[in-house]
């Protein structure tokens, strides 16, 4: 492939929608490789809980941006943006067609739309103080110092509220004034995967996750990095950790993980609807529809 501006294919969809399987079929057809845009699959030793592409799948098609760092060394959005864009540019220079696949809207848009995110590391002491104040008080503080960000952040969203306050207190500038958009010079086709039976797919994946060994994987992560590893607070690992601590029976852990995953999928779909404008694929024949749309885009 040789064209200017370079062509890039993006496949987005909620968790458990089948992105990995479809992406591999697309990559096989177009003889290309996959860039994995996922906020957890970038970490080593976290395979089951993140539904990472299997060893066989990775042998079949080369996947970039998987297993690039130890879980003890968190990668923020800005760092991931830089790593991913370099990897994608390398593919472009080799006249390959980059295929970006993921469900993390923030990470994907940072790459494809070029959002600049302030490079402010977590301020643990500040976060503890803000958490003690409570979410309602924190949101009121944010409304006073950064009203633009406050309008965009849900009153109940503690993580984003504290992050916006953190950036303000460290830099002295509102987060909203520091978000700059410098999109890469790519021509992008954004395809969307929206399954009708997503709840059933999530239920099957959740059960399979526990049958496949997420509890043992969590135990190994705790053994290597300690129980305070932040990423162990994410969906699936939090519940597995509670099982290990005898705070939760396995059946309740599966039930809770399923509920949280459905809630997460709902937020993903809302994000894609509000912040992206994908061409939604026909669920009756996903691969055929994707091929038709990509070939038309490349002509």
Swiss-Prot record:
The keyword Thylakoid does not apply. Residues 38-41 are annotated as: Interaction with substrate tRNA. It catalyses: adenosine(37) in tRNA + dimethylallyl diphosphate = N(6)-dimethylallyladenosine(37) in tRNA + diphosphate. It holds the Pfam family IPPT. It is an enzyme of class 2 (transferase). ATP binds at residues 13-20. GO terms for biological process: tRNA modification. Coiled coil: none annotated. Its EC number is 2.5.1.75. Its cofactor is Mg(2+). The record marks 104 as: Interaction with substrate tRNA. It comes from the Bacteria. Substrate binds at residues 15-20. One of its GO terms (molecular function) is tRNA dimethylallyltransferase activity. Keywords: ATP-binding, Magnesium, Nucleotide-binding, Transferase, tRNA processing. Catalyzes the transfer of a dimethylallyl group onto the adenine at position 37 in tRNAs that read codons beginning with uridine, leading to the formation of N6-(dimethylallyl)adenosine (i(6)A). NCBIfam families: miaA. Belongs to the IPP transferase family. PANTHER family: TRNA DIMETHYLALLYLTRANSFERASE. Monomer. This is tRNA dimethylallyltransferase.
């Amino acid at each position: 492939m040789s064209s200017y501006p370079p062509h890039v294919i993006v496949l987005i969809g909620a968790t458990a929608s089948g992105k990995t399987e479809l992406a591999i079929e697309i990559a096989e057809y177009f003889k290309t490789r996959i860039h994995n845009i996922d906020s957890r699959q970038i970490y080593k030793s976290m395979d089951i809980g993140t539904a990472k592409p299997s060893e066989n799948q990775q042998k079949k098609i080369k996947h970039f941006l998987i297993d690039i760092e130890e879980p003890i060394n968190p990668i923020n959005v800005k760092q991931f943006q830089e790593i991913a864009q370099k990897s994608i540019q390398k593919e472009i220079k080799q006249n390959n067609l980059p295929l970006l696949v993921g469900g993390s809207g923030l990470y994907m848009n940072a790459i494809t739309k070029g959002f600049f995110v302030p490079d402010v590391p977590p301020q643990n002491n500040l976060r503890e103080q803000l958490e003690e104040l409570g979410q309602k008080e924190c949101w009121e503080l944010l409304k006073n110092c950064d009203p633009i960000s406050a309008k965009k952040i849900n009153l109940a969203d503690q993580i984003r509220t504290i992050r916006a306050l953190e950036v303000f207190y460290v830099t002295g500038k509102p987060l909203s004034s520091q978000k700059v958009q410098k999109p890469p010079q790519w021509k992008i086709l954004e395809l969307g995967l929206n399954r009708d039976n997503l709840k059933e797919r999530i239920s099957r994946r959740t059960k399979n996750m526990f049958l496949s060994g997420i509890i043992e994987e969590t135990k190994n992560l705790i053994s290597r990095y300690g129980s305070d590893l932040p990423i162990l607070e994410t969906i699936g690992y939090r519940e597995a950790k509670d099982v290990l601590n005898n705070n939760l029976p396995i059946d309740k852990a599966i039930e809770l993980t399923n509920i949280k995953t459905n809630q997460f999928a709902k937020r993903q779909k809302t994000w894609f609807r509000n912040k992206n404008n994908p061409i939604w694929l026909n669920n009756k024949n996903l691969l055929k529809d994707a091929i038709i749309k990509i070939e038309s885009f490349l002509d």
